[in-house]
Amino acid sequence: MAGTENIHAFFGNDEARVKEAALRLSQKVAPKDDEFGLEIVSGAADNADHAVRIVGSTVEAIQTLPFFGGEKVVWLQGANFFSDNQTGKAESTLRAVESLTGLLEAGIPPEVQLIISATEVDKRRAFYKRINKLGNVETFDRVDTSKPGWEGEVMSYVAGRAEEIGLNFEGSALERFVLMVGADSRVLDSEMEKLSLYVNGRAANEEDVSQIVATSHLGAVFEIGDAIAKKNL
């Protein structure tokens, strides 16, 4: 089956991470110094007719090679019609998505890199199953904080992001940070930036975290429990 190396999909309900991963790839593979090297097709459909037009624009973009040759990137950005909603279930939408999937299965031009990003995807649909066989698919879902052990997963994410921006945590400050902020990656990134500016190069300790980080509802519960444990109430 042709074209598997130039089809990339980023799915999941963690919108910030989905968008960032797709953006990073587009910046990596898009031709440099070529304003026509990246074509973005907005995937936000208002209704089924709009979804059909979006798919048509995507197909046209894939099939239209650069006038002067070379490579191009087509990014179907933030598609909202792969989900189990009214627009996604419409017959016209399903036919359009089927035509797009058929095109991908037939193989897209090797000069084209296709990126698809979507936060809501019905994993029961044929599209999802077939795109997983066709291309490189990454999924970014929000961590379920109702399940035991969620803190470890979020701590791994924070540790990786902190390293990227040069932020270090001292002792149990990382754990406190996660327990106070929660699992929303957008909020985590924002709070890490604030904390990094505050500590200005030194390792962040628990007091820094408590002083600077905004407390989420989840964090408020933790703070109350922590205060009770320390008999501070």
Please report, for each region that a protein language model flagged, where it lies by residue.
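Conserved beta/loop motifs at nucleotide-recognition and modification sites
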Residues: M1-L233
